[in-house]
């Protein structure tokens, strides 16, 4: 199922295309020696078009790219309808943002992504032996994610089942701190959240913890893997929430939501995400990986009482710590200026912007050679880094289906699951209903690929 040169694209094949996630731009880091690319001829006078979100690459970074590479970046607002139109018209952007964990297999299966192995092989900046294993999220061999050709690269990453906790909240509730390097169980995590939550006059004043992941799609596939199973069948053409492992994962998540100890579809956080709530001392545990340290590091008092903890595990299950995002860029197969696009790709993922991201603590760099730039000046930064470095040993790719997007999965789940979270539907009934609607969507996606 590799890309076929000259294959035609139709709108029907992209009816359910969607992409989500966050790619963050960063100001260039001054004073760093840069490796020099010798792989492409893109240079002065060239321009490339990136389909990204406004926050992905700031105007000053665009100016820095022109200064460093001689290439002008033009941006197009990320919009799936516009992307479909550009792809089918044969005039796509030169680089497109996507979420490696849930988008790679979907786009690769539809023959729209350029295989980047030849580019990596010639690059003096992005060397194969320097790539962190998280970049395997951007590989797909026609059947399974994590194997085969490379179609993109993550800009940075976190192991998103890890969590931060506030020691002051634990002290106040008389709850023991989790072990520094060994995981507690999901059952213990939820019990801690029940003890940590604070309510007054029927209102939640301090959330015990949040554990909803970046997307429900990535969360539930990861939870099922942690229970020792797979949410999908062998050829990824069906989900099955009724298997013992998937049911265990689903039950735990519904129990978390029913307990109302943290934000969920039935208990919204007014801030919209964990950062401001955790920063205000109104969240005892935050299911955010290393990347949130970029915010925590800006507040010394908060950093002093914050700890990063390993991803929980199910009792008797394997120890896994996946990445639920791995957001980055891919090159359309019909892009018009591939050499210049690759030069920008190298610059964004391996030169000044990548070094700035690594130094800021907003995610783990996806080049191993950049890890020494991760913040380690203070004692609390050293403590966080110790936990994170140990956790890297437990990373693995949790493959996602090529026949449905993470956004489509989430939309269906979000329509059905609240009834179970409110106690109006049993977990078994929810599992059967999810199987029905998600498998119907997967069936349509498989027909499109065929």
What are these language model-derived features?
Residues 1-112, 122-128, 315-318, 327, ...:
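Conserved N-terminal structural module of periplasmic/extracytoplasmic solute-binding proteins
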Residues 145, 309-310, 359-411, 415, ...:
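Long, aromatic- and glycine/proline-rich binding clefts that accommodate carbohydrate-like moieties
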Residues 103-160, 307-309:
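Hinge/lid segment of periplasmic solute-binding proteins
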Residues 67, 88-89, 254-261, 298-364, ...:
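Extracytoplasmic/periplasmic substrate-recognition and gating elements
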Residues 142-156, 161, 187-239, 283:
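Extracytoplasmic/periplasmic solute-binding protein
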Residues 193-195, 235-267, 311:
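Glycine-centered hinge/linker elements that transmit conformational signals in sensory
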Residues 117-133, 179-182, 200-209, 229-248, ...:
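Short, solvent-exposed loop/beta-turn-alpha elements that line the ligand-binding surface or hinge
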Residues 76-85, 183-188, 265-279:
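Short helix-initiation/N-cap motifs at beta->coil->alpha
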């Amino acid at each position: 199922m590799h890309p076929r040169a000259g294959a035609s694209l139709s709108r029907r094949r992209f009816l359910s295309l969607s992409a989500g996630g966050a790619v963050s731009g960063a100001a260039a880091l001054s004073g760093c020696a840069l490796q020099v690319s010798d792989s492409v001829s893109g240079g002065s006078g060239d321009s490339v078009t990136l389909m990204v979100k406004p926050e992905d690459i700031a105007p000053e970074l665009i100016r820095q790219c022109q200064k460093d590479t001689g290439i002008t970046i033009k941006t197009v607002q990320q919009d799936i309808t516009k992307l479909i139109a550009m792809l089918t018209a044969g005039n796509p952007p030169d680089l497109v943002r996507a979420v490696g964990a849930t988008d790679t297999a979907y786009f690769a299966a539809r023959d729209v992504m350029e295989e980047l192995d030849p580019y990596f092989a010639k690059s003096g900046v992005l060397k194969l032996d320097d790539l962190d294993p998280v970049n395997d999220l951007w590989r797909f061999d026609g059947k399974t994610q994590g194997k085969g050709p490379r179609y993109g690269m993550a800009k940075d990453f976190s192991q998103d089942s890890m969590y931060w906790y506030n020691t002051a909240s634990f002290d106040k509730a008389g709850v023991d701190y989790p072990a520094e390097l060994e995981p507690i169980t999901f059952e213990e995590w939820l019990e801690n959240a029940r003890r940590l939550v604070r309510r007054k006059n029927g209102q939640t004043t301090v959330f015990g913890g949040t554990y909803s992941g970046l997307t429900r799609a990535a969360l539930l596939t990861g939870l099922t893997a942690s229970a020792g199973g797979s949410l999908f069948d062998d050829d990824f053409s069906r989900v099955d929430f009724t298997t013992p492992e998937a049911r265990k994962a689903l039950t735990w998540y519904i129990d978390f939501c029913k307990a109302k100890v943290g934000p969920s579809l039935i208990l919204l956080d007014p801030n919209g995400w964990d950062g401001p709530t955790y920063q205000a001392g109104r969240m005892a545990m935050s299911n955010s990986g290393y990347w949130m340290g970029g915010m925590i590091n800006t507040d010394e008092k908060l950093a002093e009482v914050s700890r990063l903890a390993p991803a929980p595990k199910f009792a008797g299950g394997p120890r896994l710590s996946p990445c639920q995002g791995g957001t980055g860029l891919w090159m359309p197969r019909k892009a018009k200026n591939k050499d210049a696009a690759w030069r920008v790709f190298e610059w964004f993922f391996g030169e000044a912007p990548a070094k700035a991201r690594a130094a800021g603590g907003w995610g783990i760099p996806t080049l191993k050679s950049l890890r020494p730039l991760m913040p380690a000046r203070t004692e609390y930064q050293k403590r966080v880094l110790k936990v994170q470095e140990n956790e890297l040993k437990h990373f693995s790719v949790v493959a996602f289906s090529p026949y449905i997007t993470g956004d489509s999965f989430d939309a269906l789940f979000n329509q059905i699951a609240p009834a179970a979270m409110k106690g109006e539907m049993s977990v078994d009934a929810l599992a059967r209903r999810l199987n029905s609607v998600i498998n119907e969507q997967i069936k349509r996606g498989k027909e499109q690929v065929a």
